[in-house]
């Protein structure tokens, strides 16, 4: 394989459709240094930042992980009008030098990062690479990354890939055409549960009110499971994980877990720092024989009670509760949001990497649901999709 440097030369071309007229604006990317070059066309503003070149260094074929870690070509699209606007991004062929062979698209892979969220890499099969929609004052900060697809064999010596980014924008879109898609990662990216709670100790509470007959921790195909069988004869009793550290008072935290029980029951589950004097605000969850996901966001209180508790069902017969993927992090849920045009394809999804887990795809429910793909049509109402994972670490 020829190891010559192959450059992606970028020309930036903007087209904005304004009512019945069409305005063309061309911006040739030639700037260097720390400047930001902006152009306004109609009610849209387009900007190129200082990091504005794409280069395939030494003709190297890259894995997706390596390609996704390039600096990329950065630009932004901003709606400075008074209503919604849509736009599409194209990678068009640009003129290559006479006598040079154009590199076949099959060798090219690309990915977009939009407002800090990386989206899954795609092969360059269609020169329209993105459809976006912006509310008034909305802005998308975009990074385009392009690399040579290591999964495609062939000689690329002496070939060139030269493209121009074309953006078509339409200012005639109503807000009834916009749908907000939330991609829920279905795990907490900055999970610190084991930092704050000792999961090696299953503590019964209190006196002889509860009897733990079996408790263990193991991993199934989805994640870590805490399995407890117990009986008890008093309300406001149960078992808990003692705290290693205290949550910072007045800070916001989110916990999430999946749970099921051998019979239908209601249990209080959560941090004692949500509330005062050992109470957690009567946060009750109805558990059934099937796993269901539960999430809660709260502001931590400062009090002497700081365990994570599983309380308040009352039955002298043995009851089994299984808690899976129990996590906590500062802030809210780990999600990505994007506004899409109703009736178009979803097209691409957030790019997620999680240690010891394999991403199975995106579904309509956090535990079960139907699987969706890039051809799924954007629904007419705001919708959340959930990542599903398979645990592949040591069990």
Predicted regions and their residues:
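Short, polar/proline-rich extracytoplasmic segments that appear immediately after membrane translocation
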Residues: 2-65, 157-161, 170-180, 393-395
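C-terminal, structured domain-capping segment
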Residues: 69-86, 90-92, 130-177
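Short proline/glycine- and polar residue-rich coil/turn motifs
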Residues: 62-66, 130-139, 284-292, 300-301
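Short, surface-exposed loop/turn segments at beta-strand-coil junctions that are enriched for proline
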Residues: 14-16, 147-156, 299-303
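Secondary-structure capping and domain/repeat boundary segments
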Residues: 175-187, 333-395
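Extracellular and organelle-lumenal recognition/adhesion modules and their flexible linkers in secreted
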Residues: 26, 38-43, 70, 77, ...
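Surface-exposed interaction patch
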Residues: 18, 22, 28-29, 65-117
């Amino acid at each position: 394989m020829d190891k010559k440097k192959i450059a992606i030369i970028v020309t930036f071309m903007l087209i904005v459709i304004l009512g019945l007229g069409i305005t063309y604006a061309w911006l040739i990317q030639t700037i260097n240094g720390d400047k930001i070059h902006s152009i306004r066309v109609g009610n849209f503003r387009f900007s190129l930042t200082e990091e504005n070149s794409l280069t395939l260094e030494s003709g190297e074929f890259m894995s997706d992980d390596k390609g996704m870690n390039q600096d990329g070509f950065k630009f932004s699209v901003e709606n400075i009008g008074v209503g919604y606007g849509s736009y599409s991004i194209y990678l068009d062929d640009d003129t290559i030098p006479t006598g040079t062979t154009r590199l076949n698209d099959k060798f090219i892979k690309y990915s977009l990062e939009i407002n800090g969220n990386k989206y899954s890499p795609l092969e360059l099969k269609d020169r329209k690479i993105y459809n976006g929609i912006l509310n008034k004052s909305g802005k998308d900060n975009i990074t385009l990354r392009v690399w040579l697809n290591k999964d495609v064999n062939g000689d690329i010596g002496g070939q060139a890939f030269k493209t121009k980014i074309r953006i078509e924008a339409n200012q005639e879109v109503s807000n009834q055409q916009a749908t907000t898609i939330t991609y829920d990662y279905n795990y907490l990216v900055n999970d610190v549960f084991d930092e704050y709670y000792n999961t090696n100790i299953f503590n019964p509470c209190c006196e002889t009110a509860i009897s733990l007959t079996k408790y263990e921790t193991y991993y199934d195909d989805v994640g870590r499971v805490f399995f407890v069988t117990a009986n008890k004869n008093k309300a406001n009793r149960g078992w808990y994980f003692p705290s290693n550290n205290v949550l910072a008072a007045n800070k916001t935290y989110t916990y999430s877990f999946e749970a099921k029980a051998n019979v239908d029951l209601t249990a209080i589950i959560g941090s004692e720092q949500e509330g005062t004097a050992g109470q957690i605000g009567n946060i009750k969850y109805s558990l059934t024989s099937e796993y269901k996901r539960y999430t809660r966001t709260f502001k931590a209180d400062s009090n002497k009670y700081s365990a994570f508790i599983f309380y308040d069902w009352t039955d002298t017969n043995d009851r089994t509760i299984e808690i899976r993927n129990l996590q906590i992090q500062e802030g809210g849920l780990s999600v990505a949001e994007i506004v899409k045009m109703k009736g178009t394809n979803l097209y691409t999804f957030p790019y997620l990497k999680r240690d010891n887990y394999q991403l199975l795809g995106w579904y309509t429910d956090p535990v079960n649901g139907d699987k969706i793909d890039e051809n799924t049509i954007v629904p007419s109402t705001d919708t959340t999709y959930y990542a599903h994972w398979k645990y592949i670490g040591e069990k």
